[in-house]
């Protein structure tokens, strides 16, 4: 077993029981009782059972010195990035010495990512929209759409007039301002998020509009290949060595108008990943979690599940399983899709599920009960699991089954589930050592890059003052343990990660 998990908690419980009995069975002073309780909490915390070696202790001492200094300054000034909206805090995070260390840290894997939200939008604007044959149109609602075609794309009711972007840029007075306007349409970033996004409906509307806007750029075959490569490059530069991507596998098109199917897309993911590994031999690779939107009818989802079964049979090393994406609050519940989701089991076919569940503020509804239904349907991991702390029995069951939650703090904040990340419900789960991994969801749409920003928010905000190098190490190892890789692949990954970790520790401890 790569990392100690909940199956090994009985030994810890015995130790904690011994600690408890020591002060219940004897007359301890208040100070002694206090010390015992603090020790108990320390051991329960995520990573609390890890024993650091000498070098790690030295690195931890330096890291915590910087962290405590930054937090004390925040207490003095009341300017604390995790308590602020990410759009307003990002520049402060980038000044942080702790953040610089987190960027250096080998983070293992990113296990919760969406296909067209993971490459920085600046690349999309400065690179992709400057390529030949790129056209733009504006729908009657004023929403941008893009299409590569020669000579021009086919017109429709939504796009009655296409303009070659190269010609359009020649006509605008300020090209830089135009490109900046594209960036504003490709991300949620704004200087005044509380004013612009007054509620969850508003921010989700813009969020889903962005996917509609950029889809025509990314799903052009030459761009698609480059996009997949660029996504690996950006995460590799952020010291992430493996990615699992939720992908809807929408049709990819050629300049001629020809369209490719899901198999072509999966094969392209596979080929591009192999090409990337050739020049980055420590990179483990990528897997695809085929996904469909939870707004669709049951019959459509049933067909998507059959497609997922076929893709996994044909590409067992690439396709990890299936998920449902889209806003939970307005989409179908897992219970609605139960019959469709039972198709693989009834047919004797193994199709792993990686369900989004509990990405909501509401309690006692079919929405937050998605967490329960995800577990009943044998989900491998729980995407977000924001509502898990409100369901103690479900929480205990997921812990017993060793099913982790995928925590995406910046996404949860930007999409208005929580404003101050110190109040994120996963803080309670971290304090008790619940299985979890950290990921970044759609970092490009939030103006972020890679995984480091989310790690910063967790380490500084959600984990509180006591989260230290043990916490970070446990999270990195968890990302390997809970990945969809085979055990032999996890062992290889762990060896590569360990070498990088030791170098990172030496750098932090000595520089």
Curated annotation (Swiss-Prot):
Residues 30-100 are annotated as: Dimerization. Glycans are attached at residues 127, 174, 185, 378. Residues 1-29 form the signal peptide. It is an enzyme of class 3 (hydrolase). Binds 1 zinc ion per subunit. The keyword Hydrolase applies. GO terms for biological process: adenosine catabolic process; inosine biosynthetic process. InterPro entries: A_deaminase_dom, A_deaminase_N, ADGF, Ado/ade_deaminase, Metal_Hydrolase. It is found in: Secreted. Its EC number is 3.5.4.4. Disulfide bonds join 137-159. Residues 127-185 are annotated as: PRB domain. Substrate binds at residues 115, 204-211, 293, 326, 442. The keyword Secreted applies. Its main location: secreted. Pfam families: A_deaminase, A_deaminase_N. It catalyses: adenosine + H2O + H(+) = inosine + NH4(+). Zn(2+) binds at residues 112, 114, 356, 441. GO terms for molecular function: adenosine deaminase activity; adenosine receptor binding; heparin binding; proteoglycan binding; zinc ion binding. One of its GO terms (cellular component) is extracellular space. The active site is at 359 (proton donor), 384 (proton acceptor). Adenosine deaminase that may contribute to the degradation of extracellular adenosine, a signaling molecule that controls a variety of cellular responses. Requires elevated adenosine levels for optimal enzyme activity. Binds to cell surfaces via proteoglycans and may play a role in the regulation of cell proliferation and differentiation, independently of its enzyme activity. This is Adenosine deaminase 2. It comes from Pongo abelii. The gene is ADA2.
């Amino acid at each position: 077993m790569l990392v100690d998990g909940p199956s090994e908690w009985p030994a810890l419980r015995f130790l904690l029981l011994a600690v408890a009995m020591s002060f219940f069975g004897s007359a301890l002073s208040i100070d002694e009782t206090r010390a015992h309780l603090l020790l108990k909490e320390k051991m329960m915390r995520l990573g609390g059972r890890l024993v650091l070696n000498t070098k790690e202790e030295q690195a931890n001492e330096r890291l915590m010195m910087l962290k405590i200094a930054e937090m004390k300054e925040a207490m003095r000034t009341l300017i604390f990035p995790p308590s602020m909206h990410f759009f307003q805090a990002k520049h402060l995070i980038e000044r942080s010495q702790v953040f610089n260390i987190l960027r250096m840290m080998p983070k293992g894997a990113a296990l919760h990512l969406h296909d067209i939200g993971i490459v920085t939008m600046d690349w999309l604007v400065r690179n992709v929209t400057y390529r030949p044959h790129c056209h733009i149109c504006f729908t009657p609602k004023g929403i941008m759409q893009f299409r590569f075609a020669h000579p021009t794309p086919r017109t429709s009711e939504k796009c009655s007039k296409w303009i070659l972007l190269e010609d359009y840029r020649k006509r605008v007075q300020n090209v830089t301002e135009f490109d900046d306007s594209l960036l504003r349409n490709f991300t949620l970033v704004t200087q005044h998020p509380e004013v612009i996004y007054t509620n969850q409906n508003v921010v989700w509307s813009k969020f889903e509009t962005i996917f509609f806007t950029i889809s025509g750029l990314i799903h052009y075959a030459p761009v698609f290949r480059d996009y997949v490569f660029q996504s690996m490059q950006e995460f590799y530069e952020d010291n992430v060595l493996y990615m699992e991507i939720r992908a809807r596998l929408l049709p990819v098109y050629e300049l001629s108008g020809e369209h490719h199917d899901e198999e072509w897309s999966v094969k392209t993911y596979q080929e591009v990943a192999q090409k990337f590994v050739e020049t980055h031999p420590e990179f483990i690779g990528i897997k695809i979690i085929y996904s469909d939107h939870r707004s669709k009818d049951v019959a459509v989802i049933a067909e998507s599940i059959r497609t997922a079964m076929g893709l996994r049979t044909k590409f067992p090393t690439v396709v990890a399983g299936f998920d449902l994406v889209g806003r939970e609050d307005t989409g179908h519940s897992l219970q609605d899709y139960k019959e469709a989701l039972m198709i693989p089991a009834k047919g004797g076919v193994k199709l792993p599920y990686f369900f989004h569940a509990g990405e909501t503020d509401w309690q006692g509804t079919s929405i937050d009960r998605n967490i329960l239904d995800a577990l009943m349907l044998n989900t491998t991991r729980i995407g977000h699991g924001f509502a898990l702390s409100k369901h103690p029995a479900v929480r205990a069951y997921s812990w017993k089954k060793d099913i982790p939650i995928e925590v995406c703090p910046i996404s949860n904040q930007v999409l208005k589930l929580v404003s101050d990340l110190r109040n994120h419900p996963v803080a309670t789960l971290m304090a008790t050592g619940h299985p979890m991994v950290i990921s970044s969801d759609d970092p490009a749409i939030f103006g972020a890059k890679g995984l480091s920003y989310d790690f910063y928010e967790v380490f500084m905000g959600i984990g509180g003052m006591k989260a230290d190098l043990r916490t970070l190490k446990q999270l990195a190892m968890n990302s390997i343990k809970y990945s969809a890789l085979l055990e032999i692949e996890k062992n290889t990954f762990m060896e590569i990660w360990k070498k990088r970790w030791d170098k990172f520790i030496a750098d932090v401890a000595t520089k």
